[in-house]
Structure formats: structure tokens, C-alpha cells
């Protein structure tokens, strides 16, 4: 048997992992500006944490979850999304307590798992970056969170992004709309896809965002949620729209957008961009005011979003956006002869302890091969260390770009390489 990675997974190799680290670091920097702190939850949860919150009839639960019984006969699932685990953690750790500052703002990063047909930007193990804000029903929280997502996408370089906005209203408005949708779709049931015929019975709002051609035709003249909003829901949505306009955030009202999770109410949104003629959602989220109470906590408002790292990187690549990845070595030490082996090890370690990114040769190769390695690593400076340099205590440090050279002592390199580095035209942080 040939041992390979499971279908729908990937190995993120060093050339790619640098991009991942950049995206994750960039997200952390943006989130910190908005006073978010990181939370890390287990990658597996009790089955009910996901099924009851995401919705028993959703595609995620009925078709896509990886679930199993462990050796203690506990029903476990690999997390398919990030919000439910964070809410579970919020309640379990009593972060709703009076002494905890409100609103409570958290972000998370990590792998999620869904049994889907693998395709570009969508894998069975995928990685999500997300945020959750607890304790504020103020529509300004909706807008701040959406604006933070827009801020991140703009700063990282995603082009042509459009914000699609909708509301699901409060439970009363949603229930009224649900019935109106059932009344509209029931006579058309036989024209719907098999999945949407099932959805009509279980979760009729999901028919609205079906990608099947026959379903799109069926919902063309469907009633709009906007016609079923009560005063509270209308006031909240109007405030969100007005504040987005005040911040200069453009949006498109998309009444067919419902999101694939049952816990949403009021504001929902997606950031969408077009790649090769296809609309791709790069970030999505919304408000979920009933989820904390559903997990046994007090009535607590919530708002958040998630974005897929694989899809984000795919879009950046397709749009030709080069991330500013700094992979260059500061110093490469070419080693000539066994007599220089120990000193080279001491020297490269001293450089690293001074904060420089340094490497040396370990393979006793010819100098030409070592110089080629220095070029492959894009080394800024090059030191050639042989037995004669060890004996004299003097060595040549070369600017590997301009070929400028300086003669210095090994002691100076070991103790204060910054001075030499700057003399050769480079700057230390």
C-alpha cells in the first residue's frame, strides 16, 4: 500500500507555509487593533455541540460532518466550523460573568473538517480564521465587525470585493417569512431539486441559496424577507445600513442570502469576489443572539464571521497579489575544511543569538556549491571560513548583492555583527 495523505487534505510545505504565516500574522495585527484576543478550542467536540447549534437539518450536519464514537462510547465530531465551539467555551468558562469586560471579543484560527467534494479552495480539512463578539446587541457592533472584515480584506490586497447584506430579522419576523416562503414554494415543489424538496420540509429558507438551476428559477419571484420585518427588525437593519454608509462601506442588499447555519438572526453578510467568472465568498458571518442561551448561558447577543484561509490564498494567487514574504538569509557561512567546522558552528550560533537569520554548510561541499546555496537562500551577506581564517582570527564578509567586502575579526562577528551588517548597506531592526 502506498502511503499518501487522505483525500481532501494537503501538505503545506515551507514555500507555502510562509504565506500562511503572513496571513495569520496580518489577521492577528488587524484584530488586535479592534481589541480582540485569541481563543483556542479543541478540534473535536461532543456531537451535540455542533448538531444542535448549527442545525440538525443543515447540510453540514446531515452530509458533511466527520463524527464517530470514541472508546468511551461518546459521540464525537471533528469541528466543521468555529462559532459553536467558541460559544460552548464562552458558556463553559463563564465568560459571561459580571467581572468580565463586555463586549467580549475573541478571534480564532485553526483547522475545520467537512466531508465535501474536494476542489480548488475547498478541502475536507480546511483552515478558518474567525471572530466572535459577545454581549452587544447594538447595531454598531454589526457594523464594526463587518468594517473590520472589510479592513482586513482591503489591507491584505483582495480586489473587487463586494459586500452582500441581508437580514433574517428576529424570531417572529423569521417565522412569518418562513411560512410565506412555504406557501409560495409548495405549489412549485415538483419543479425543485431533490435536495430543495427536502429543504422545503425541513428548512425552507435554504432553498433560497441553492445553486441548482431549477431552484434559482423557482425562487425568482419568491417573497422578500424585507416585507416581513417587524418594527424591531426593521429598525435594527436600517441602523446597520445607515452606519455602513456613514463609514463609507458600500453594500448590496441580497434578499436570497440566508447563510447555511440555523443560528443566525438579524444581520447576515458575505464578502464576494469574482474569479474566472465565478462568484467566490471569501468571508461571511452575522448575528446570533440566541446561541449563548441555547448552550445554557444567559441571554447574550453575539456577532461574528469566518473566512477560509485556503480560499483567501487562492483568490490572492488568481488576482496576482504577491504577499511581502521575507525569506532571505542575513548571513550564509561557507565552510572550507574540517578545521573550520567547530568555529563555523560557534559563529553561526553567535549570529543567531544576536537576532540574525543565519545558516552554514554542513556537507563539506566545494565552495562553488556552497556559494550557489547562498544564492538560493538569497543570503544578504556571505562569510567564507577556512582553516586559515580560524588561525588568523580574521575573515572576509561580503555583500552578496554588490560584492562589496570588509575584513573583520571573528570576535567582532561573534559580538557585534550589526556594525558590519550596516557597513555593508543593510539595516537591522
Curated annotation (Swiss-Prot):
PROSITE patterns: AA_TRNA_LIGASE_II
GO cellular component labels: cytoplasm
CDD domains on file: HisRS-like_core, HisRS_anticodon
Designated gene of the protein: hisS
Protein name as catalogued: Histidine--tRNA ligase
Assembly behavior: Homodimer.
Entries under Pfam families matching the protein: HGTP_anticodon, tRNA-synt_His
Entry keywords, A to Z: Aminoacyl-tRNA synthetase, ATP-binding, Cytoplasm, Ligase, Nucleotide-binding, Protein biosynthesis
Biological process (GO), any one: histidyl-tRNA aminoacylation
Keyword Repeat attributed: no
UniProt GO MF annotations: ATP binding; catalytic activity, acting on a protein; histidine-tRNA ligase activity; transferase activity
Amino-acid biosynthesis recorded as keyword: no
Family indicated by similarity: Belongs to the class-II aminoacyl-tRNA synthetase family.
EC number assigned by the record: 6.1.1.21
InterPro entries, A to Z: aa-tRNA-synth_II, aa-tRNA-synth_II/BPL/LPL, Anticodon-bd, Anticodon-bd_dom_sf, His-tRNA-ligase, HisRS-like_core, HisRS/HisZ, HisRS_anticodon
Coarse class of the protein's main subcellular location: cytoplasm
Annotated organism of origin: Streptococcus pneumoniae (strain ATCC BAA-255 / R6)
Catalytic activity: tRNA(His) + L-histidine + ATP = L-histidyl-tRNA(His) + AMP + diphosphate + H(+)
Subcellular location(s) of the protein: Cytoplasm
Amino acid at each position: 500500500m502506498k502511503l499518501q495523505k487522505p483525500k481532501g487534505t494537503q501538505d503545506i510545505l515551507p514555500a507555502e507555509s510562509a504565506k500562511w504565516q503572513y496571513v495569520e500574522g496580518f489577521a492577528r495585527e488587524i484584530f488586535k487593533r479592534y481589541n480582540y484576543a485569541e481563543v483556542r478550542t479543541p478540534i473535536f467536540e461532543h456531537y451535540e455541540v455542533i448538531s444542535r447549534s448549527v442545525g440538525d437539518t443543515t447540510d453540514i450536519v446531515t452530509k458533511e460532518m466527520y463524527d464517530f464514537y470514541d472508546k468511551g462510547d461518546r459521540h464525537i465530531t471533528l469541528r466543521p466550523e468555529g462559532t459553536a465551539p467558541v460559544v460552548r467555551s464562552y458558556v463553559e468558562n463563564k465568560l459571561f460573568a459580571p467581572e468580565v469586560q463586555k463586549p467580549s471579543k475573541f478571534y480564532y484560527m485553526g483547522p475545520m473538517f467537512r466531508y465535501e467534494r474536494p476542489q480548488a479552495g475547498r478541502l475536507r480539512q480546511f483552515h478558518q480564521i474567525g471572530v466572535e463578539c459577545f454581549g452587544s446587541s447594538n447595531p454598531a457592533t454589526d457594523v464594526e465587525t463587518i468594517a473590520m472584515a472589510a479592513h482586513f480584506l482591503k489591507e491584505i490586497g483582495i480586489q473587487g470585493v463586494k459586500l452582500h447584506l441581508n437580514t433574517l430579522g428576529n424570531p417572529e419576523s423569521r417565522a412569518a417569512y418562513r411560512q410565506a416562503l412555504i406557501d409560495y414554494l409548495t405549489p412549485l415543489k415538483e419543479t425543485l431539486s431533490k435536495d430543495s424538496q427536502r429543504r422545503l420540509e425541513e428548512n425552507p429558507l435554504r432553498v433560497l441559496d441553492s445553486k441548482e438551476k431549477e431552484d434559482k428559477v423557482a425562487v425568482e419571484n419568491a417573497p422578500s424577507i424585507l416585507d416581513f420585518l417587524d418594527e424591531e427588525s426593521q429598525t435594527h437593519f436600517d441602523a446597520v445600513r445607515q452606519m455602513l454608509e456613514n463609514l463609507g462601506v458600500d453594500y448590496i442588499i441580497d434578499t436570497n442570502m440566508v447563510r447555511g447555519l440555523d443560528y443566525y438572526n438579524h444581520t447576515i453578510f458575505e464578502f464576494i469576489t469574482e474569479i474566472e467568472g465565478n462568484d467566490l465568498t471569501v468571508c461571511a458571518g452575522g448575528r446570533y443572539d440566541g446561541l449563548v442561551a441555547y448552550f445554557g448561558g444567559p441571554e447574550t447577543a453575539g456577532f461574528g464571521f469566518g473566512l477560509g484561509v485556503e480560499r483567501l490564498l487562492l483568490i490572492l494567487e488568481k488576482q496576482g497579489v504577491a504577499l511581502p514574504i521575507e525569506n532571505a538569509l542575513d548571513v550564509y557561512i561557507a565552510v572550507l575544511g574540517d578545521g573550520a567546522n567547530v568555529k563555523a558552528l560557534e559563529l553561526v550560533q553567535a549570529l543567531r543569538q544576536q537576532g540574525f537569520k543565519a545558516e552554514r554548510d554542513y556537507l563539506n561541499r566545494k565552495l562553488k556549491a556552497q556559494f550557489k546555496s547562498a544564492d538560493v537562500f538569497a543570503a544578504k551577506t556571505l562569510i567564507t571560513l577556512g582553516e586559515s581564517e580560524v588561525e588568523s582570527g580574521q575573515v572576509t564578509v561580503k555583500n552578496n548583492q554588490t560584492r562589496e567586502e570588509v575584513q573583520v575579526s571573528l570576535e567582532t562577528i561573534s559580538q557585534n555583527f550589526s556594525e558590519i551588517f550596516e557597513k555593508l548597506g543593510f539595516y537591522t531592526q
